[in-house]
């Protein structure tokens, strides 16, 4: 129980507009307060029916301590205010929970790595991975994929930063390109692949996010991700 953490970042407005990504509600996330150099983060705004997924994730967390059942349908908007520009793909907000033994976040990341044909670019503040992900990244390079990872240049946690750097050598030896964001700390959690699919969310590329935390992300396909 002590290992689990609500790491999701969700804002829903009137059931029609949703925000998610790496941002927390703190001054350093908008660089109003500088702690680790320039703070780099990402988030997405979505409109329409996809927002309902974010609403459900928020409600299940809000009511986590209650033993009573609540009808979530009463929070469902009667009408969605859709964007003026029709999307040319789809967006699927998804959640990850340590309680169901289904590593959704890890599976999304692995599927993107394994499907990549031209490139896959990754932003992550922490890089602490198991052999399954490490091998997938190196095998992607072997089949001709341009694999690049951006990590922080200035750490927020020095010990975790040292552990992150310990993974550089086997990945670089396998052909993965790793760059450090030298102006400061990159807190973004992004995967983008082949100009076709991407995900933005809260899930770090480390063991705790992939297995122990409540997380969420937004998967995008065939749109301007």
Report each predicted region and the residues it spans.
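Charged, low-complexity intrinsically disordered terminal segments
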Residues: 1-225
């Amino acid at each position: 129980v002590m290992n689990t953490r609500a790491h999701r970042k969700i804002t829903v407005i009137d059931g029609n507009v949703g925000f998610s990504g790496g941002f927390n509600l703190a001054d350093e996330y908008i660089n109003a307060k500088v702690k680790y150099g320039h703070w780099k983060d990402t988030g997405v705004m979505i409109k329409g029916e996809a927002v309902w997924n974010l609403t459900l994730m928020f409600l299940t967390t809000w009511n986590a301590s209650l033993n009573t059942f609540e009808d979530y349908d009463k929070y469902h908007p009667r009408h969605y205010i859709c964007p003026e520009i029709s999307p040319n793909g789809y967006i699927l907000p998804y959640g990850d929970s340590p309680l169901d033994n289904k590593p959704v976040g890890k599976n999304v990341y692995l599927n993107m790595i394994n499907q990549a044909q031209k490139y896959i670019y990754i932003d992550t503040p922490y890089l602490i991975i198991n052999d399954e992900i490490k091998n997938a990244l190196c095998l992607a390079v072997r089949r001709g994929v341009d694999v690049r990872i951006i990590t922080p240049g200035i750490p927020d946690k020095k010990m975790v930063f040292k552990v992150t750097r310990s993974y550089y050598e086997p990945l670089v030896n396998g052909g993965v390109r790793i760059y450090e964001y030298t102006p400061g700390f990159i807190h973004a959690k992004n995967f983008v692949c082949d100009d076709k699919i991407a995900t933005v969310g809260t899930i770090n590329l480390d063991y705790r996010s992939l297995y122990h935390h409540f997380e969420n992300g937004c998967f995008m396909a065939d749109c301007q991700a």
